[in-house]
């Protein structure tokens, strides 16, 4: 429950900040990285005078890896909601980019039981991630991002102290590519 409040508060700060100031903003599509599969994101600097910014997105996730959840499903698909704070290094059109965030996901998992019947169930989970990459922003508004996104599962516990069966991956390194438009 604490993560949900944190995500909601951070999302409201990013969106409300964008509504009241004129600064560099962008929409971009991301392949892999924090999106896991494919996502659409909004990114904005917190003011005209800072290199600090944030992003919020929605992503479709699809995996046939049995390592995604502790229950080892044969297929996982669903929606995730990455949110992050980032910092741009450098001036002009070429930037190094570092960021830290979390992604919360709602997933549908499928496996076959011992009798061969297909069993489907819903679950949720979250993972923390870093963005370590390069960002190019052209004068015409085109933005390109490439880099690595190390991530680690954030374990959750119920009221009795037992670990929930959320995202179970050990540390992973997802490459990412993003293309979008600055305005």
Which functions belong to the PLM regions below?
Residues 1-5:
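Positively charged n-region of N-terminal signal peptides that target proteins for export
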Residues 6-15:
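Sec-dependent N-terminal signal peptides
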Residues 17-21:
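Sec/Tat signal peptide C-region and signal peptidase I cleavage site
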Residues 23-25, 113-117, 159-163:
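Extracytoplasmic loops and strand-loop junctions of Gram-negative outer membrane beta-barrel proteins
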Residues 23-36:
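Short N-terminal segments immediately surrounding and downstream of signal-peptide cleavage
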Residues 38-142, 146, 180:
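Gram-negative (and chloroplast) outer-membrane scaffold detector with strong preference
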Residues 88, 103, 149-152, 171-174:
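Structured catalytic cores of enzymes that bind and process phosphorylated ligands/cofactors
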Residues 169-183:
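Outer-membrane beta-barrel "beta-signal"
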């Amino acid at each position: 429950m604490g993560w949900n409040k944190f995500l909601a508060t951070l999302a409201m700060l990013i969106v409300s900040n964008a509504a009241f100031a004129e600064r560099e903003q962008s929409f971009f599509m991301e392949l892999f990285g924090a999106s896991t599969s494919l996502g659409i994101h909004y990114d904005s600097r917190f003011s005209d005078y800072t290199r600090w910014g944030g992003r919020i997105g929605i992503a479709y996730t699809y995996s046939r890896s049995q390592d995604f959840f502790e229950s080892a499903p044969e297929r996982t698909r669903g929606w995730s909601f990455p949110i992050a704070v980032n910092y741009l290094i450098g001036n002009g059109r070429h930037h190094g980019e570092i960021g830290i965030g979390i992604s919360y996901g709602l997933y549908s998992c499928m496996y076959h039981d011992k009798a061969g019947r297909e069993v489907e169930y819903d679950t949720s989970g979250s993972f923390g991630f870093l963005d370590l990459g390069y960002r190019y922003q052209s004068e015409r508004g085109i933005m390109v991002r490439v880099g690595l996104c190390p991530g680690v599962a954030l374990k959750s516990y119920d009221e009795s102290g037992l670990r929930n069966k959320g995202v179970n991956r050990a540390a992973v390194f997802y490459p990412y590519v993003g293309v979008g438009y600055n305005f």
